Amino acid sequence: MRKMKKVMLTTGGTGGHIYPALAVADRLKIKGIEAVFVGSMERMEKDLVPESGHKFIGVDISVPRGLKNIRKYLKAIRTAYKVIKEEKPDAIIGFGNYISVPVIIAGILLRKKIYLQEQNVNIGSANKMFYKIAKMTFLAFDKTYDDIPIKSQSRFKVTGNPLRKEIDGLKYATEREKLGIKPSEKVLLITGGSLGAQEINNIVMKYWEKFCADKNLRIFWATGNNFEQLKKVRKTKKENDRIEPYFNDMLNVMAAADLVVCRAGALTISEIIELEKPAIIIPYGSIKVGQYENAKVLTNYDAAYVFTRDELDESMKRVFEIIRNDEKLKKMRIRLKPLKKPNAAEEIIASLDIWRN
């Protein structure tokens, strides 16, 4: 009997790294390939992975700053080495973050087939360490090629970001009906990501009375956990508005939305593309790096509006300008269609060289 193939996935720390890995793990399982996840025993992956039905092995990993942490990091490499020898994976996929580094290093020492997946336009520091060694690096966006030497581009492949299976089949009309949204109502989703965004919350509060005055505007606002004015907002909101720290049905809400106000995290951008959602984007951080580069994926197609932290008032004015402009919203949705990459997990798995010893 042929031994079941096994793929080791490694990353952690944030949902932006973990959820793409879980999407690939889910697809591996469907194909009869065992997935084993190695991450930090202290970060969110220790709960998310087992809850998703996959094997999780926790390693004591810290950012290697200072002599004590460097020693701890070296110990993590030794632990990962033992784990890989015991698990005998046919391939290892790193999804970025410092948590993946000890596992990738141990995999290289054991001559395992190494693959990488990069969620953002800019390649992260962990993946930068290894992409010249990896058999293949899977990219979310074509724009990443701009920073890759031509001679190295054959070892990269654009697949899109693997997204949670819950996104499959979500339809605008169906989700609106489930949420009890009337045909005459427009839906605005406001989210700063899983941790919230104080800048976004503050500017929404500044315009809150105007939002409340529009009786045919349904607001779904994910504030994050540290929003001090949450109680006040809940007292003044319209009856059908939903104001919560986080929505467990976030993808369903996004599918039902007419417009999204959000950051430019890699998965948020990929979900906006897949669900064809017009967006007002307020990226986190510097205008020259990080989330701004992710946002350009949409602005290059005139499929979103992007505002800096110095343009927050302008961002809200644009919300009121286009939320009822059906023609503008339709054009933005159409422009998102060419960017869709719905089979990312499938393409990644198909590219793995795991059938030869």
Swiss-Prot record:
Residues reported to bind UDP-N-acetyl-alpha-D-glucosamine: 14-16, 120, 164, 194, 291
This protein's pathway: Cell wall biogenesis; peptidoglycan biosynthesis
Protein task: Cell wall formation. Catalyzes the transfer of a GlcNAc subunit on undecaprenyl-pyrophosphoryl-MurNAc-pentapeptide (lipid intermediate I) to form undecaprenyl-pyrophosphoryl-MurNAc-(pentapeptide)GlcNAc (lipid intermediate II).
Name by which UniProt lists this protein: UDP-N-acetylglucosamine--N-acetylmuramyl-(pentapeptide) pyrophosphoryl-undecaprenol N-acetylglucosamine transferase
Superkingdom of the organism of origin: Bacteria
Keyword Transferase: yes
UniProt record, GO biological process: carbohydrate metabolic process; cell division; cell wall organization; lipid glycosylation; peptidoglycan biosynthetic process; regulation of cell shape
Stored SUPFAM superfamilies: UDP-Glycosyltransferase/glycogen phosphorylase
Pfam families referenced in this protein's UniProt entry, alphabetically: Glyco_tran_28_C (PF04101), Glyco_transf_28 (PF03033)
Species classification: Bacteria, Fusobacteriati, Fusobacteriota, Fusobacteriia, Fusobacteriales
EC number, UniProt record: 2.4.1.227
InterPro entries given in the database record: GlcNAc_MurG (IPR006009), Glyco_trans_28_C (IPR007235), GlycoTrans_28_N (IPR004276)
Principal cellular location given in the protein's record: membrane
Keywords of the record: Cell cycle, Cell division, Cell inner membrane, Cell membrane, Cell shape, Cell wall biogenesis/degradation, Glycosyltransferase, Membrane, Peptidoglycan synthesis, Transferase
A cellular-component GO term for this protein: plasma membrane
One term of GO molecular function: UDP-N-acetyl-D-glucosamine:N-acetylmuramoyl-L-alanyl-D-glutamyl-meso-2,6-diaminopimelyl-D-alanyl-D-alanine-diphosphoundecaprenol 4-beta-N-acetylglucosaminlytransferase activity
Membrane topology value: Peripheral membrane protein
Gene: murG
Family affiliation: Belongs to the glycosyltransferase 28 family. MurG subfamily.
Catalyzed chemical reaction(s): di-trans,octa-cis-undecaprenyl diphospho-N-acetyl-alpha-D-muramoyl-L-alanyl-D-glutamyl-meso-2,6-diaminopimeloyl-D-alanyl-D-alanine + UDP-N-acetyl-alpha-D-glucosamine = di-trans,octa-cis-undecaprenyl diphospho-[N-acetyl-alpha-D-glucosaminyl-(1->4)]-N-acetyl-alpha-D-muramoyl-L-alanyl-D-glutamyl-meso-2,6-diaminopimeloyl-D-alanyl-D-alanine + UDP + H(+)
Record-linked PANTHER family: GLYCOSYLTRANSFERASE, UDP-N-ACETYLGLUCOSAMINE--N-ACETYLMURAMYL-(PENTAPEPTIDE) PYROPHOSPHORYL-UNDECAPRENOL N-ACETYLGLUCOSAMINE TRANSFERASE 1
Protein source organism: Fusobacterium nucleatum subsp. nucleatum (strain ATCC 25586 / DSM 15643 / BCRC 10681 / CIP 101130 / JCM 8532 / KCTC 2640 / LMG 13131 / VPI 4355)
